[in-house]
Amino acid sequence: MQLTNLADVDTNLETTDHLTKGMLEGALPDKRFRRHITDAVVEVINSEPDSELRRVFRDNTLTYAAVLSTGKYSLAAYVNAVKFVSLKLMGDKSSTAYSKVFPDRYQNLIDKGASGSYIASFADNYSKTGLITKIMEQTMVPTHILNAG
């Protein structure tokens, strides 16, 4: 069997690791969220200085957007939750992920002289919220897919 030459296909190569409003708009499950897409929401992802980590945040934000249709969550809360889950999946402890996602809250606790275990309790509490739990459920790969092949 001989293969014939196929015409070159113009592909849209990924040239950026930044999230755009258009990308987010296309991933959202419902039109009601689209009006809440602001520069500030997009900047939560794009402000990450490490381009590889920024790419992970962007991809996960686009991948898990269906979670928004399962409850009453704000877009900003969703983006922060995705960052938190992404950091946890990459090996950060809850308190470390919490400090990266909410640096102002973390610094406020430090300024008040909170102990490490006290701060960890806030992070642990956040990790058990409904939104975080639903995003974590989305990250789980079914066993039949893992064992396929």
Across the structure, where does each feature detected by a protein language model lie?
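N-terminal, charge-rich alpha-helical recognition modules
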Residues: M1-N147
